[in-house]
Amino acid sequence: MSIVVKNVTKFYGQQKALDNISFEIKTGEIVAFLGPNGAGKSTMMKIITGFIPASSGQVFVNGEKIDADNFEIKQHIGYLPENNPLYLDMYVREYLSFVASFYKNRPCKSVDEIIDLTGLKKESHKKIGSLSKGYKQRVGLAQALIHNPDVLILDEATTGLDPNQIVEIRDLILETGKDKTVMLSTHIMQEVQAICDRILIIDKGVLVADEKKSEIYSKVQRKRQIVNVEFDAVPDEDALAMAVNADSITRTGEKTWRIESLEEEDVRSSIFTFAVANKLTVLSMQKEEANLEEVFRELTK
């Protein structure tokens, strides 16, 4: 199922939280929704899931308009909110059975099946309030998945988890997302790199990027080149810096250097020329490209 957002604006009183947002997520895509705190990510997700209305604009899921009264289309959406609201006095199995009872028109997974899928088997007899943060997140993900939704909206699904738990939840999202349309917000860029096809970036309520993961880096043009090079012997550092017109040169290992240059022309050819002139062999050389953190900072500063 696709998600189509058309010219969505949202006001809270006089404050504009979203400003004329439009995008489309196609069936089967896993899309990251990034932005600083307070940028409007959670607001947009609440509008997509029908929890709150937009002030203007429209949202369509599978061609059907999302509004407060369209309960049928909401049956196709699984949602894990940022604060993961749970009934802490209920037992895990009891809670998931309770959630499943609301989706009578959906081919729900069995409680046992969803417990196995989300790694809750050992904790299923416990009250939710006694679980660790990681297992509470798993319960939240289980309730979002139990009705086998076609669309999955995950707001900070890995917040507060340790590295092992993050990898486990990431793998779970990848596995369950194979036949679903997934939109997730996160501050963990490695997560985006690992599982997402496309990236949306929002800042101050405005959509500032909508790119495939492989193309997002073109949004940032570095003002300097950074090259890491390894020689077979130690060169004269001053001579190397002069030959490549380096703005900065840092020794990073026994025979390795990190060279920064403001030159417009590719400095790698100058490094090779220097090596030949000084009877050196270049063992390795790599030009650093902009990373996702740089793109994020550049577009949201």
Place the predicted regions along the sequence by residue.
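ABC transporter nucleotide-binding domains
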Residues: S2-V5, K10-D203, L207-A209
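Hydrophobic side chains in well-ordered alpha-helices
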Residues: S110, D236-L240, V267-I271
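ABC transporter nucleotide-binding domain
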Residues: D171-R258, L262
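A generic structural signal for secondary-structure junctions
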Residues: G78, K104, G119, L200, ...
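Short beta->alpha junction loops/turns
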Residues: I66, K104, D232-A233, E264, ...
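C-terminal coupling/interaction segments
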Residues: E263-K301
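Residues at or immediately flanking beta-strands
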Residues: Q58, I226, T281-S284
